[in-house]
C-alpha cells in the first residue's frame, strides 16, 4: 500500500519530503527539537495505513477523472472548479486527519486554511486549465496533519520516559 501511495502521489507531483516539510512546520510551532527524519518517518507511517491508501487512491482518481472531463452534469464543474461550498474533499481530509483524533483534525483545519508548501502549490496549480487537485490538496494536508500529530505523540512519549519521577504502569498491574 505504501509503495502504491508513493507512486501515485509522485505521479501527481507530491513527494514524501514535501509532505514532511508541512508536518515539520506544523509541529515545530508546538514542539522543540523535532527532526525532519521523524517527520518523514511519520508521513511514511500514515501512507502505509489501509484507510489512507483508500483515500489517496480515490482522491487522485477523482481529480484525474475531473481533468479528463469524465463526470456528467454539474458535479463535473463543481469538482473541476473546486467550488468553495463543495465540502466532500474536506470531509475526506477530516477523515484521514481524524485517525489521530481531534488534534489531527485541528491540525488539518489549520493546514487547510493557511495553505503552505505543497498544499499551496497543489491548490494554486488546480486553478490552471486542465489541472484538478480538488481532492489531492486536502488529502495531502490531512496526511501532513496526521503525521504532525503522530510526531507530537511520539515526542511526548519519549519525554515521559526521560522523566525520572514517572513510573509506567498498566491497568493489569493493579
Label the model's feature ranges.
Residues 12, 32, 36, 85, ...:
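Intrinsic-disorder-associated interaction segments
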Residues 2-66:
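N-terminal interaction modules that seed assembly of large macromolecular complexes
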Amino acid at each position: 500500500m505504501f509503495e502504491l501511495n508513493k507512486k501515485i502521489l509522485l505521479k501527481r507531483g507530491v513527494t514524501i519530503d514535501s509532505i514532511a516539510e508541512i508536518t515539520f512546520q506544523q509541529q515545530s510551532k508546538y514542539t522543540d527539537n523535532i527532526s525532519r527524519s521523524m517527520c518523514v518517518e511519520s508521513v511514511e507511517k500514515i501512507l502505509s495505513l489501509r484507510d489512507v491508501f483508500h483515500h489517496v487512491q480515490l482522491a487522485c482518481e477523482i481529480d484525474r477523472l475531473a481533468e479528463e472531463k469524465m463526470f456528467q452534469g454539474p458535479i463535473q464543474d463543481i469538482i473541476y472548479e473546486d467550488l468553495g461550498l463543495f465540502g466532500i474533499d474536506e470531509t475526506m481530509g477530516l477523515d484521514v486527519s481524524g485517525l489521530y483524533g481531534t488534534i489531527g483534525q485541528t491540525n488539518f483545519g489549520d493546514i487547510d486554511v493557511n495553505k503552505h508548501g505543497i498544499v499551496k502549490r497543489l491548490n494554486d496549480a488546480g486553478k490552471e486549465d486542465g489541472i484538478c487537485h480538488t481532492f489531492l490538496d486536502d488529502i495531502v494536508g490531512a496526511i501532513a496533519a496526521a503525521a504532525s500529530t503522530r510526531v507530537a505523540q511520539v515526542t511526548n512519549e519519549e519525554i515521559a520516559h526521560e522523566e525520572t519521577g514517572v513510573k509506567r504502569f498498566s491497568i493489569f498491574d493493579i
